């Protein structure tokens, strides 16, 4: 399967989800990549930001779940990455995980951002759980 075909399949899958399922999917994908370490938090954030559709969907996810803290974190991540001239498209994306350790200012900023992430993600997960419990019909279809 070609890269273009693979992207098309992914986009069709995503489009078939409900708004709630999309929000949960985006959270799951992002969280599972960034929660492993500071370096993964940095690299995956840069990679997502370089894909405008994914970055916008990620922001929409936290708006959907009314999670202002995580939305603010994303805005701060974006600001920091742009300040350090990180690409906003995959066309120019050559970012490596090593770059974080090579730039002391960037490293210090992302250490602070990662500390915020570690502090807020338990509340984010709890908020999402409560939201799903109260709006189950937006996430699953129960056959009678």
Task: Locate predicted features.
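Extended, alpha-helix-rich binding/interface surfaces that flank or overlap catalytic cores
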Residues: 1-55, 61-144
């Amino acid at each position: 399967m070609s890269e273009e075909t693979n992207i098309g399949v992914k986009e069709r899958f995503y489009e078939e989800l409900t708004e709630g399922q999309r929000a949960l999917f985006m959270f799951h994908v992002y969280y599972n990549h960034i929660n492993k370490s500071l370096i993964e938090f940095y690299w995956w954030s840069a990679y997502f930001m370089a894909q405008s559709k994914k970055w916008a969907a990620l922001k929409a996810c936290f708006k959907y779940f009314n999670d202002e803290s995580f939305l603010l974190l994303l805005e701060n991540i974006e600001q920091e990455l742009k300040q350090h001239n990180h690409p906003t498209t995959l066309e120019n994306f050559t970012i490596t995980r090593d770059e974080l350790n090579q730039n002391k200012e960037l490293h210090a900023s992302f250490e602070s951002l990662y500390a915020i992430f570690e502090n807020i993600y338990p509340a984010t997960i709890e908020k999402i759980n409560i939201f799903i419990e109260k709006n189950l019909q937006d996430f699953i279809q129960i056959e009678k």
